[in-house]
């Protein structure tokens, strides 16, 4: 029994971070029980993809305890319903919600053959997928008899509080607020007046970068090949990960930030850092690769109803949105 911490920023307390401990247990498990308060759309999409790619995880039961009474976004609800359909069709588990009371706990149980580990503490499911999250979490790591007791407690919680998401009434109202960037590390919100002043100025340099819609790169990195570790576990690319591959005729222009970091300020008031990378002397492209950038791009498309879960960005997507360049 020991505590584990997020270890983000300058506060490294334990040797292994909470994310590393959770993911190691998850990768080696054949059965997983999860009871969490909140989930993000991207965490559910990525969990679904992982289960498609790794069939050694035989069963997952997931209880989402807060959203049914507090409110879902359309994307959250849709991704959970799709995950539930997949799990039930494959006979590998189900997704549950709490329609009677708000459940705010965070409990996880991992069974690897007969060995059981557990985690209980402050971290919602989202924390284990989102490397941009700024919230510092801590959990208690259990094994042996305490882990077996926690497993039984999670099963009891799901049984007593949970109803399958398809067996409860569909929500009549959804939350449409786009908060993808609000809790991200390195992201600031800029006052509207400052944004108006900045965008009223004439830029010294101006670049129009086409939004490319290749099947498995650029804005569709999620659909590229996942990362396979030594044990054969395949982890998909993050849903919000993107890369903008910029052609040499743009990168060679005066003022383009070659191999350096720069500050991004968006028209809807977000500020964060990006950087260009790539071997300028050997290739005709450079990359701006950042999950925060992807949250902004895909978040805009999602909030305008142009992009759905597990859907590729196409020219039609961009035309529907009304902009095909940056």
UniProtKB/Swiss-Prot annotation:
List, in alphabetical order, the Gene Ontology terms for molecular function in this entry.
type II site-specific deoxyribonuclease activity
Enzymatic class: hydrolase
* Listed transmembrane segments: none
Q: Could you tell me the EC number(s) of this protein?
A: 3.1.21.4
Keyword annotations from UniProtKB, A to Z: Endonuclease, Hydrolase, Nuclease, Restriction system
Q: Name one Pfam family in it.
A: RE_NgoFVII_C
The protein's matches in InterPro entries, at most eight in alphabetical order, are given as: RE_NgoFVII_C, RE_NgoFVII_N
Main function: A P subtype restriction enzyme that recognizes the double-stranded sequence 5'-GCSGC-3'; the cleavage site is unknown.
Protein's name according to its UniProt entry:
Type II restriction enzyme NgoFVII
């Amino acid at each position: 029994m020991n505590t584990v911490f997020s270890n983000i920023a300058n506060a490294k307390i334990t040797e292994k971070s909470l994310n590393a401990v959770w993911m190691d247990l998850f990768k080696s498990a054949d059965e997983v029980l999860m009871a969490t308060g909140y989930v993000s759309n991207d965490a559910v999409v990525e969990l679904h993809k992982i289960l498609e790619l790794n069939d050694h995880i035989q069963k997952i039961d997931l209880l989402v305890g807060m959203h049914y009474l507090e409110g879902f976004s359309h994307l959250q609800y849709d991704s959970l319903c799709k995950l539930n359909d997949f799990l039930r069709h494959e006979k590998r588990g189900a997704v549950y919600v709490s329609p009677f009371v708000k459940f705010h706990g965070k409990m996880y149980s991992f069974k690897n053959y007969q060995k059981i580990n557990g985690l209980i503490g402050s971290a919602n499911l989202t924390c284990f997928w989102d490397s941009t999250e700024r919230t510092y979490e801590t959990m208690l790591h259990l094994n042996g008899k305490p882990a077996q007791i926690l497993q039984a407690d999670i099963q009891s919680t799901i049984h007593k509080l949970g109803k399958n998401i398809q067996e409860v009434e569909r929500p009549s109202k959804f939350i449409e607020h786009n908060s993808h960037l609000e809790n991200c590390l390195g992201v600031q919100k800029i006052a509207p007046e400052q944004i108006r002043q900045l965008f009223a100025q004439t830029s010294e340099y101006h670049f129009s970068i086409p939004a490319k819609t290749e099947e498995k790169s650029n804005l569709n990195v999620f659909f590229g090949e996942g990362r396979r570790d030594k044990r054969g576990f395949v982890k998909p690319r993050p849903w919000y990960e993107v890369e903008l591959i910029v052609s040499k005729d743009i990168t060679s222009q005066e003022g383009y930030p070659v191999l350096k970091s720069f500050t991004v300020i968006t028209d809807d008031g977000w500020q964060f850092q990006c950087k260009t990378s790539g071997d300028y002397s050997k290739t005709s492209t450079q990359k701006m690769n950042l999950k925060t950038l992807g949250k902004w791009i895909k978040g805009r498309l999602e909030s305008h109803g142009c992009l759905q879960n597990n859907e590729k960005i196409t020219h039609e997507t961009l035309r529907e949105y009304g902009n095909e360049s940056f």
